[in-house]
Amino acid sequence: TLTADENIVLPLSLTRRTANEAWRRTVVEAVGLQDRLTHRPAELSGGQQQRVAVARALITRPAVLFADEPTGNLDSHTGGEVLDLLRRSVDEFGQTVIMVTHDANAASIADRVVFLKDGRIELDEDRMTRDAIYDTIKGLEVPR
């Protein structure tokens, strides 16, 4: 079983690339794992395991990053750090992030918010506040 650090750099190892140490530190610090890098999965909480997965996805600096509920099992502080890192990935590194979330706070950092209902696009808006997202969700709910 791999350590958290080995797991994070696995995509680089598979392609015989080495990690840029400054970027690796940035990613590890952003997800708060600097003290857990030598731990194996059984020694990590569910949230810590999710943070390893987020770091592993970011380590290669892909042009497009798909994030499915990236803050789902994280506390609000760590979730905020992950969202900050995703935002920085867009603003500083020119990456595109496509995020699926039910969290209005997470959606509010996006440049574009698309609402789906019954498999169809109901609304496609540029930047929305958290409150506007909540109001939109309320308007899309199916009456019981």
What is each stretch, according to the model?
Residues 2-9:
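Short coil-to-helix segment of the ABC ATPase nucleotide-binding domain corresponding to the Q-loop/switch region
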Residues 9-21:
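ABC-type ATPase nucleotide-binding domains, specifically the catalytic core motifs of the NBD
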Residues 40-50:
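Conserved ABC ATPase signature
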Residues 54, 82:
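Hydrophobic anchor residue at the start of the ABC signature
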Residues 61:
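Conserved catalytic motifs of ABC-family nucleotide-binding domains
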Residues 65-68:
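Catalytic Walker B motif of ABC-type/P-loop ATPase nucleotide-binding domains
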Residues 120-144:
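Conserved beta-strand-loop-alpha-helix hinge in the C-terminal portion
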